[in-house]
Amino acid sequence: TGADVSFSRVPKKWFIKGDKDKNYYLCANAVQNVSSETADNALKAMKNWSGIDNLKNIKNETLIVWGDKDTSYNFEQVDTLNKNIKNSRLEIFENCSHNVHLEKPNEFNILVEKFINQ
């Protein structure tokens, strides 16, 4: 199905190096276990859902991490989170795609540790 094709392509876009990234297999394996029906339902839900009105209800300090090469979420979407979550902070990682935590794990872990301990 179209969902199968889409889901098989998605993990490549989550890494700057695509399927050549050392951690690509983690995401590729994860989507292999998704049924066609589940994949199709997920795509429909993502297309038709918006949680923007609910963002104002988030009161906790929130760290938003985004890779500047992410093709899953564009900057406008991430900026919407940052502008609508009162206590949020946006950190942008250069030369990273969707999986910042896998592409730059040391820098990501340092950032999260500092955020938690602030």
Region spans (language model):
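Catalytic active-site module of serine/aspartate enzymes centered on a nucleophile-bearing elbow/loop
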Residues: 88-118
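Conserved alpha/beta-hydrolase "acid-adjacent" motif
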Residues: 71-77
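Hydrophobic "lid"/C-terminal helical patch
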Residues: 10, 43, 81, 108-112, ...
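Active-site acidic short loop of glycosyltransferases
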Residues: 59-60, 87
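Structural signal for short hydrophobic segments within the conserved structured cores
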Residues: 44, 63, 89-91
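Conserved alpha/beta-hydrolase catalytic His-Asp/Glu region
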Residues: 2-56
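Glycosyltransferase donor-binding loop in the core domain
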Residues: 31, 47, 70, 97-100
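Short beta-strand/loop motif that positions the catalytic acidic residue
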Residues: 58, 64-66, 70
